[in-house]
C-alpha cells in the first residue's frame, strides 16, 4: 500500500505550537510590565527582538503594540486633563482665599488618578451646593425682590403729581405704629389730597409730598364749593392790578408756559378767555388739573373785575340809589299821593267829585249785596 506524505499544514501546526505559547507568554509579561511602567513599556517592546521567527509572530506583536500605544495615550491624556483641572481649582481657591496653592505632583499614575477622583468629587459637591443654594433661595429671592422693588420705587420716584379725586381735612390726630410704614401720620387741620377711595375704609392720599394710607373716619371730605372761593380770593389778590395783554395775565398766575398754545388756538386777547371752559383746555392738551383750575378761576375773576369797573364808571345811578336809601325814612313819613296835581282854585270841586264817586261806589255795593241775601 501507498503511504501518504504528511501535508504542509500538519508540519506547520507542529512548528507553530511552541511559537503560540511563547507569544502568549510574552504578551502576558508585557501586560504586567505595562501596569508598573506604562511609559517604558512601548520602548522595551519595540527594541526587544524576542520573536524574530515567522510572519505570524510579527502580526501578533504589532497588534499588542497598538493596544499598548492606545493605553499609553489614554494615560497621558488623563494626566494632562487632571493637571489642567487641578490648576484651575487652585487658581479659584487662590482668588477666594488669597493664599498660594500647593504644587501637586502627578508623576505617578496612581497619584494622578487619585487627584482626578478627588477633584471630580469636589467639583460635583460644589455644583450640588451651588444648585441647592440657587434652588432653595429662588423663592426667597423673588419675595425679597418684589419688596425691594417697591421700596426702590417709593425712594427713587419723585413726588406723586396726580390725578386726585378730592381733598379731605383731618379732624382727629393719628400716629401709626413704627412697623406700619404705609400709613400717614396725620394731625388735626391737615389737608390730604385723596388719590383713591376703597370700600374697606382705608383711603390712599398724599400729605407733605408723601403717599400713604389713612382711615376715612379721621377726615372730613372738602366739597368743591368750599375749595373754590379760597382760590378765587387768592386770584383776586394777585390780579389787583389789571393786566392788559394775555401774556401779562398768564405771567401773573404763573402759567406763562401756555401762552404759545393759547395764541396758536385763537385766544389772542383777554376777551377771548371769557367763554373758555375746562373741556376747551383739555382739547388744548393742558393735562395738569391744578393749572386748568387756576386758569378758569383767573378768567372768572377777570370778568368780575370788568363788571365792577363798569359799575364804578357809572356814578349817577349809584348816587341816585344812595340818595334814595338816605331819603327812604323821610318818604315813609309823608302821606301817600295819588300822583295827580290839584290846584288851589279847584280844590273844592275836587273834593265834591271825590265824594260823588265814593257815594256811587257805595250804592253799587249795596245793590250787589241785596239779591244775594
Curated annotation (Swiss-Prot):
Q: What's an example of a GO molecular-function annotation for this chain?
A: phosphotyrosine residue binding
> What positions are modified (Phosphothreonine)?
76
User: One Pfam annotation, family name?
Assistant: SH3_2
Gene Ontology biological-process entries: negative regulation of adaptive immune response; negative regulation of B cell activation; negative regulation of peptidyl-tyrosine phosphorylation; regulation of intracellular signal transduction
> Where expressed (tissue)?
Detected in peripheral blood B-cells (at protein level). Detected in spleen, liver and peripheral blood.
Enumerate the spans annotated as SH3 domain: 163-224
Question: Which keywords does this Swiss-Prot/TrEMBL entry list?
Answer: Cell projection, Cytoplasm, Nucleus, Phosphoprotein, SH3 domain
Here the segments flagged for biased composition (Low complexity) are 123-146
Induction (record text): Up-regulated in peripheral blood B-cells by IL4, IL13 and by CD40 stimulation.
The compartments listed are: Nucleus; Cytoplasm; Cell projection, Ruffle
Q: Which SMART domains match?
A: SAM, SH3
The UniProt regions of compositional bias labelled Basic and acidic residues, in chain numbering, are: 37-48
Name of this chain's protein: SAM domain-containing protein SAMSN-1
Q: Which organism is it from?
A: Homo sapiens (Human)
Amino acid at each position: 500500500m501507498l503511504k501518504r506524505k504528511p501535508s504542509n499544514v500538519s508540519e506547520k501546526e507542529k512548528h507553530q505550537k511552541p511559537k503560540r505559547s511563547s507569544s502568549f507568554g510574552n504578551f502576558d509579561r508585557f501586560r504586567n510590565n505595562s501596569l508598573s511602567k506604562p511609559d517604558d513599556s512601548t520602548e522595551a517592546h519595540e527594541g526587544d527582538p524576542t520573536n524574530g521567527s515567522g510572519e505570524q509572530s510579527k502580526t501578533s506583536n504589532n497588534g499588542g503594540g497598538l493596544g499598548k500605544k492606545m493605553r499609553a495615550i489614554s494615560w497621558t491624556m488623563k494626566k494632562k486633563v487632571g493637571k489642567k483641572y487641578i490648576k484651575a481649582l487652585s487658581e479659584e481657591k487662590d482668588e477666594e482665599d488669597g493664599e498660594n496653592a500647593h504644587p501637586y505632583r502627578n508623576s505617578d499614575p496612581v497619584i494622578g488618578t487619585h487627584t482626578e477622583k478627588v477633584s471630580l468629587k469636589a467639583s460635583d459637591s460644589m455644583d450640588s451646593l451651588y444648585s441647592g443654594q440657587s434652588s432653595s433661595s429662588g423663592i426667597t429671592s423673588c419675595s425679597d425682590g418684589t419688596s425691594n422693588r417697591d421700596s426702590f420705587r417709593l425712594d427713587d420716584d419723585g413726588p406723586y403729581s396726580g390725578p386726585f379725586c378730592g381733598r379731605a381735612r383731618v379732624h382727629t390726630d393719628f400716629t401709626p405704629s413704627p412697623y406700619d410704614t404705609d400709613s400717614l401720620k396725620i394731625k388735626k387741620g391737615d389737608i390730604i389730597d385723596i388719590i383713591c377711595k376703597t370700600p374697606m375704609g382705608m383711603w390712599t392720599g398724599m400729605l407733605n409730598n408723601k403717599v400713604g394710607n389713612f382711615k376715612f373716619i379721621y377726615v372730613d371730605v372738602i366739597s368743591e364749593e368750599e375749595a373754590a372761593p379760597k382760590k378765587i380770593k387768592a386770584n383776586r389778590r394777585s390780579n389787583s392790578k389789571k393786566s392788559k395783554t394775555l401774556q401779562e395775565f398768564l405771567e401773573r398766575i404763573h402759567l406763562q408756559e401756555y401762552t404759545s398754545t393759547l395764541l396758536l388756538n385763537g385766544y389772542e386777547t383777554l376777551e377771548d378767555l371769557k367763554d373758555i371752559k375746562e373741556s376747551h383746555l383739555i382739547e388744548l392738551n393742558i393735562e395738569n388739573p391744578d393749572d386748568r383750575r387756576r386758569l378758569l378761576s383767573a378768567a372768572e375773576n377777570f370778568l368780575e373785575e370788568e363788571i365792577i369797573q363798569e359799575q364804578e364808571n357809572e356814578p349817577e345811578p349809584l348816587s341816585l340809589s344812595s340818595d334814595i336809601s338816605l331819603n327812604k325814612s323821610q318818604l315813609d313819613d309823608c302821606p301817600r299821593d295819588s300822583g295827580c296835581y290839584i290846584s288851589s282854585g279847584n280844590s273844592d270841586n275836587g273834593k265834591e267829585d271825590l265824594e260823588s264817586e265814593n257815594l256811587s261806589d257805595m250804592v253799587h255795593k249795596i245793590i250787589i249785596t241785596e239779591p244775594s241775601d
